[in-house]
Amino acid sequence: MYILDTNVILELRKAGKTHQNVRKWAERLPSASLYISVISVLELEIGILLIDRRDKEQGAILRAWMDRHVLPTFSGRVLAIDTAVAQRCATLHVPNPRSDRDALIAATALVHGLTVATRNVADFERTGVAVLNPWEA
């Protein structure tokens, strides 16, 4: 089972233009085996709001994608940050501090026994989490 990093969610949005390895990888998996972190929801929401400020039309398209596709697709499979995740995340910052968002995604994966699917493998090095790069799968 996998937790999708934000870059994988965005790649899967590219209808007809999704990298073939990512598309084939995702098609082989049952949707019930794919999860996202509330951190990815945060990152997507920030991106939508920033784009909407400069391009209302594109902002509306992204808002519709988020509300009609991402959230319904992952309904019941958006993993929250709870006490166990927060405590595990803290251990990932010592002795080497890292990005809070990446550490929270890694901690969520560790607590729930998931593999992180990401293009940014280096962001998750030395966390102890299993990582898969779907672009190379």
Positions of predicted regions on the chain:
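Acidic, PIN/NYN-like endoribonuclease modules and their adjacent C-terminal/linker elements
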Residues: M1, A106, L110-A137
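Short, well-structured N-terminal submotif of metal-dependent ribonuclease cores
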Residues: M1-I39, L50-D67, A137
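Acidic active-site catalytic centers that drive phospho-/nucleotidyl reactions
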Residues: D5, E43, D102, N120-D123
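A generic structural signal for short hydrophobic patches within well-formed alpha-helices
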Residues: I9, V41-L44, A86, F124
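Residues that scaffold the ATP/ADP-binding catalytic core of kinase and kinase-like folds
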Residues: E11-R13, G47, R88-C89, T127, ...
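Structured helix-beta-strand junction loops
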Residues: L29-A32, T73, H112, T127
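Residues at the C-termini of beta-strands that transition into short coil/loop
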Residues: V38-I39, D82, N120, W135
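Active-site neighborhoods of divalent-metal-dependent phosphate/nucleic-acid chemistry enzymes
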Residues: I46-I51, P72-R119
